[in-house]
Amino acid sequence: MKKIITLGLAASVSLSAQEAILDLTKLHSYADQEVPDYINRDNTPGNNPITDIGATLGRVLFYDKKLSKNSTVSCASCHKQEEAFGDSAIASVGVAGTTGRHSMRLINARFANERRFFWDERAPSLEAQTTQPIQDHIEMGFSGADGDPDLSALVDRVSQIELYQVLFTAVFGSEGVTEARMQRALAQFVRSIQSFDSKYDRGFASTPNPNADFSNFTAQENLGKRIFTAPPGPGGGAGCAACHQPPTFDIDPNSGHNGVTGSIGGGQDLTNRRSPSLRDVVDHNGSPHGPFMHDGSMATLLDVVNHYNAI
């Protein structure tokens, strides 16, 4: 039983076997998280700023398996918090099989010049992206094709849940559930997922020049940073920063195909031009939050470096 306490209104809603309390008068601070001064890229649209209550609704939706056809898969099933909101599996498991591409990490999705989403950039915004997996036959099953119910069936399902009646009213002023409202809430939560506590951030804070050596880096780490940042050429670097732009390490919107042409299901996949941020590619022990690339074909960062060295 999950309990809701909101502005004097108490409601009990059965969502899981776990006991939890959500007090809408004491929300987690999503809107006012500290962002370093040197982070100046933000794809948040003016009509959907992050709010504490909006991101709270988005978080509940993100973790709710009832958003899938058979109530077995949530957004978090493929975008796992412990994997930088990505997946350790090459292909994620949906309601009707495995996905055709590796699940992209969501860390720092907000802090980027690129506004399009998915590996092939088919979604024009994060808002538009959030409900496409829900409407995918394999992923969450509200496709409206191949015998699946369509999204209106999910809207009806969510509308009947008392928890969502309370939350949608708190966010939007009425309990009406629509795709657009779900998109806005989910996008607010995803944009609230941020990471700026790395060794790089500590170095940049004391030496605010991405091309200078950082005093907290080892000699090898500073060499790696120079190789990453410097353009290719005699005595130059690898030019990684031309596409993965410091200090956010988001993908340049003008980046082309990266030369990885494989597909999880076999054959070629030539439409991929996007990348997640390179932040949180490993955990605090140095283990990769991988595998990497849209086809999950590279298990280690050394595999990635060797790929680019060969093309």
Predicted features and spans:
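Hydrophobic h-region of N-terminal signal peptides that target proteins for export
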Residues: 10-17
